[in-house]
UniProtKB/Swiss-Prot annotation:
Residues 14-137 form the Rhodanese domain. Signal peptide: none annotated. It is an enzyme of class 2 (transferase). Belongs to the SelU family. Keywords: Selenium, Transferase. This is tRNA 2-selenouridine synthase. It comes from Proteus mirabilis (strain HI4320). SUPFAM superfamilies: P-loop containing nucleoside triphosphate hydrolases, Rhodanese/Cell cycle control phosphatase. One of its GO terms (biological process) is tRNA wobble uridine modification. The keyword Acetylation does not apply. Involved in the post-transcriptional modification of the uridine at the wobble position (U34) of tRNA(Lys), tRNA(Glu) and tRNA(Gln). Catalyzes the conversion of 2-thiouridine (S2U-RNA) to 2-selenouridine (Se2U-RNA). Acts in a two-step process involving geranylation of 2-thiouridine (S2U) to S-geranyl-2-thiouridine (geS2U) and subsequent selenation of the latter derivative to 2-selenouridine (Se2U) in the tRNA chain.
Amino acid sequence: MESTLSAQNIRRLLANETPIIDVRAPIEFNQGAMPNAINLPLMNNEERAAVGTCYKQHGSQKAVELGHQLVKGEIKAHRVAAWREACERFPSGFICCARGGMRSHIVQKWLAEIGIDYPLIEGGYKALRQATIEMTNELVQRPIILIGGCTGNGKTTLVRSLPEGIDLEGFAHHRGSSFGRTVEAQFAQATFENYLAVDMLKKSSYHSRWVLEDEGRAIGANGLPESLRIQMATAHLVVVDDPFERRMARLKEEYFDRMTHDFIEAYGEEKGWQEYSDYLHHGLYAIRRRLGAQRAAELTQLLDNALAAQKISANTEVHFSWLSPLLKEYYDPMYRYQLSKKQDKIIYTGSYEEVEQWFANH
């Protein structure tokens, strides 16, 4: 049985989207996981905490004994059945725990007892995590081109359409502004970084450069890896500059049409509408100090009126009453100021289609 993976084999495992049965507790998995991992824990959070306390107070042997007491009988049978099903679904996968230690070996042993020979990752999640950090630091050294432009210019769509594009906002489950959250919760920082690293690794054999959206230090709660930020700070910039009306049409579809649909699909009609309303209010509230108290109150009233009108008519263009001044008075001046400090890095400016063609030719 192959149970020891070299660093190169770990990279191959990640690049090939090899399934990983992660047997850590959910709390550990939620703090950092790999893209192709499923969480089927040996111990749940409470059991893990109890064993950890026992280990501190009474040592390793007592902790192991407690673990076996907690996971036996029907509980053990249920978990073994779940691992068996996963092994049958993913015959080429690997078992993973925190460091490739006792938990992986116990699961491997219990599977062997029912006739399933399944390998584990020596070094566990820690080895995988170290590999993704090293991969990121190495791969970001390739040339980077950033796509910039005011909000609504389709930058994210353009990045996603390019084979060498790296979709930072997609991995972050966030679009970067105060209105950037999506229905999906953001990943833990380590998980975000792992997804980014694995995507770059998978594309690295076919592309010698990266195209990314011009982002700040963080996208919502997810910070960009320092090695990537350093490279982005000196990267060339291509700017998308579409007419205002076209930008508004994109924002209508993305922030109102799609978000209404996504919230209602996720939460149901009544709660979904309330979540959608709260989402827009929170976005405006987050920038109230920069708008000034009076202007923030005026735009909030326009937002309330627009929501009431949308609920009756299902027409989302009613939000232009507050979105248009918000762009003209706040977002556009802010981005143009930021862009003025990067003039020496701009190598091309054009409409969405012109920038699309520029990338096809360069």
